[in-house]
């Protein structure tokens, strides 16, 4: 299993405990140090391209990475590299923000957001990249289904017209930002490289 952009290694620790052979791909020297202190295997590399051989991975996981691509060409290359690096039958898990829900906050929450991610754009990107899309899940934090829908409805209150103006007068701008950030909707895609997985 390869994770692109592993953060502080939460998934990596769980994967190793579950018996997976895990490798993180990271660029930040600070995070690389944190990951190695946790005993995780790390490759220092920018992506794309991916620092893996052809058909080297059973699973590639990328959580909130694609929206940081410089544009469609980099997003296509990222997807092509995932396809190249996966074994036939391997799975690509991709988590991205849902721009259609976030709109202006997509840009405000992180200045490095460049590539707009929506359900349809992501489906097209993955299909055009040669993947079979098996599933898409909408989430707010770890909440999905009805719980996500309830949180999404609650989010309407912090996005009412005048909330930003009022927050400036009441000194609650940072609080409103944090609430919006915690109610940020993501899309998780499970995609599969066509072909039969090799039998072990």
Q: Each predicted region: which residue ranges?
A:
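Conserved SAM-binding loop
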Residues: 1-104, 119-123, 189-193
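Ser/Thr- (and often Asn-) enriched beta-sheet segments in non-cytosolic proteins
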Residues: 23, 130-132
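Generic structural signal for residues in well-ordered beta-strands
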Residues: 42, 133-136
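Short, solvent-exposed loop/helix junctions and linker helices
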Residues: 72, 115-116, 181-182
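A C-terminal cap/extension of S-adenosyl-L-methionine-dependent methyltransferases
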Residues: 93, 135-200
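Short leucine-rich amphipathic alpha-helices used at interfaces
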Residues: 99-100, 105-107, 169, 174
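Short glycine-enriched, charge-decorated loop/helix-capping segments at active-site entrances
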Residues: 108-113
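Short alpha-helix
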Residues: 114-130
């Amino acid at each position: 299993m390869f994770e692109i952009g592993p953060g502080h290694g939460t998934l990596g620790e769980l994967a190793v405990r579950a018996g997976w052979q895990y490798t993180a791909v990271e660029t930040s020297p600070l995070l690389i140090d944190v990951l190695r202190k946790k005993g995780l295997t790390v490759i220092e590399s920018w992506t794309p391209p991916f620092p893996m051989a052809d058909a080297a991975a059973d699973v590639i996981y990328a959580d909130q990475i694609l929206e940081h691509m410089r544009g469609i060409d980099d997003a296509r290359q990222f997807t092509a590299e995932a396809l190249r690096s996966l074994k036939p039958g391997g799975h690509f898990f991709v988590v991205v923000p849902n721009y259609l829900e976030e709109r202006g906050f997509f840009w405000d929450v992180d200045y490095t957001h460049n590539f707009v991610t929506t359900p349809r754009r992501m489906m097209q990107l993955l299909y055009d990249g040669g993947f079979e899309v098996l599933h898409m899940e909408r989430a707010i934090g770890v909440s999905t289904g009805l719980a996500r829908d309830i949180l999404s409805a609650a989010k309407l209150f912090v996005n009412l017209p005048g909330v930003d103006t009022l927050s400036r007068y009441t000194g609650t701008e940072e609080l409103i930002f944090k609430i919006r950030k915690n109610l940020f909707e993501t899309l998780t895609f499970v995609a599969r490289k066509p072909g039969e997985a090799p039998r072990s």
